[in-house]
Amino acid sequence: MNETLYCSFCKKPESRDPKKRRIIFASNLNKDVCVCEYCIDVMHGELHKYDSKYDRMDSLLALKRDRLRRMESSAYEEEFLLSRIPAPKELKAVLDNYVIGQEQAKKVFSVAVYNHYKRLSFKEKLKKQDNQDSDLELEHLEEVELSKSNILLIGPTGSGKTLMAQTLAKHLDIPIAISDATSLTEAGYVGEDVENILTRLLQASDWNVQKAQKGIVFIDEIDKISRLSEHRSITRDVSGEGVQQALLKIVEGSLVNIPPKGGRKHPEGNFIQIDTSDILFICAGAFDGLAEIIKKRTTQNVLGFTQEKMSKKEQEAILHLVQTHDLVTYGLIPELIGRLPVLSTLDSISLEAMVDILQKPKNALIKQYQQLFKMDEVDLIFEEEAIKEIAKLALERKTGARGLRAIIEDFCLDIMFDLPKLKGSEVRITKDCVLKQAEPLIIAKTHSKILP
């Protein structure tokens, strides 16, 4: 028999090296069974551990349950291995459907995600080739250790940082956990432990450890845990440098013990162990004041330099010149910055982009509200001037695209309250509805007149 044999229990292949894994093949009642020597040793030990046949039966059932768990785990790995990883252009095209503008950031993000999961796919191929003779090319590739491409996103609130991560995670069918760094504290203090981030990822993975270990962790407001100076603090900093040190452990890749089902840690309790080596970490923040640090560095040798307030365009342009030392000066520890090698900046949203965000993406807010009204057989129309005023209001509030829903909810609340009564009508949102809280125009289609 020339084909490679696989153990029917642990699913491991037979080694061509006689000193390694050997497999016994048996055919009985038209059913082929293969058992490796390691599984035979395990079963032999379990069967002789008990005296009664009932204890032996319980032991065999336990072995079967353990085998099913391992099969489920390996099935996910196999599924991930065989699934085609979309090219960066395909990933960017997906982002284009939901994120307006930010072209450079979307390119950087797509390439980083592609390289990360290509790395995981390669690692799984190496596992599958374990105990088998590989070709010269594979042996050459084994000598190269591929590092993780964790990402640091710098951009104002509502510019699309979180949305990009959520969009690709959904497209790739990968679990994602989103956390706010401002709520994190060092272990032992009031607040949220860093390990709770991984608990959220496990919950998003339906407590499937293998699936969680290939997921995405998004940590927002990372700039809010910066230390106050470049020099190491001699006092206890439970929500700044201390949290950065705790994050460093899980971001760089380590085995972390998580309480089962999100419970609290107990010295004698059981733990779920997660390897963070293959989890993609994305950290993001607005980094207010970083532009001034970069400007000071880039203009320090210019005679007659005076501190002048920069315009928005100048701030966006200078942020693209950010270097590691600027982030250290801002308050991030060098070790953490080193674990976030992919850096991208996002621009603030312009008025034109905000108008497009309201209308063009697949999940555009205007499309969502029109669909909600259509469920009650009511047509919702937004006039162009009204859309512009909504965009202007969001820019004035400095909430980015995130604040658009609150603005629309404000003037649509009363009309949605009476929506079931307006079946067969048309509701028109005008400029005055946004600026002066005027009532929307309600037009009865059948009578073609404005209702009081």
Curated annotation (Swiss-Prot):
Instruction: Tell me where the signal peptide lies.
Output: none
Q: What Gene3D superfamilies does the record tag this protein with?
A: 1.10.8.60, P-loop containing nucleotide triphosphate hydrolases (3.40.50.300)
- CDD domains per record: RecA-like_ClpX
- Gene Ontology CC: HslUV protease complex
What are the GO MF terms of this UniProt record? ATP binding; ATP hydrolysis activity; ATP-dependent protein folding chaperone; protein dimerization activity; unfolded protein binding; zinc ion binding
Keyword set, alphabetical order: ATP-binding, Chaperone, Metal-binding, Nucleotide-binding, Zinc
Q: Which residues bind Zn(2+)?
A: C7, C10, C36, C39
Reported function: ATP-dependent specificity component of the Clp protease. It directs the protease to specific substrates. Can perform chaperone functions in the absence of ClpP.
Q: Family per UniProt?
A: Belongs to the ClpX chaperone family.
What is said about its interaction partners and assembly?
Answer: Component of the ClpX-ClpP complex. Forms a hexameric ring that, in the presence of ATP, binds to fourteen ClpP subunits assembled into a disk-like structure with a central cavity, resembling the structure of eukaryotic proteasomes.
Name of the protein: ATP-dependent Clp protease ATP-binding subunit ClpX
What organism does the UniProt record list as the source? Helicobacter pylori (strain J99 / ATCC 700824) (Campylobacter pylori J99)
Which gene name does the record give? clpX
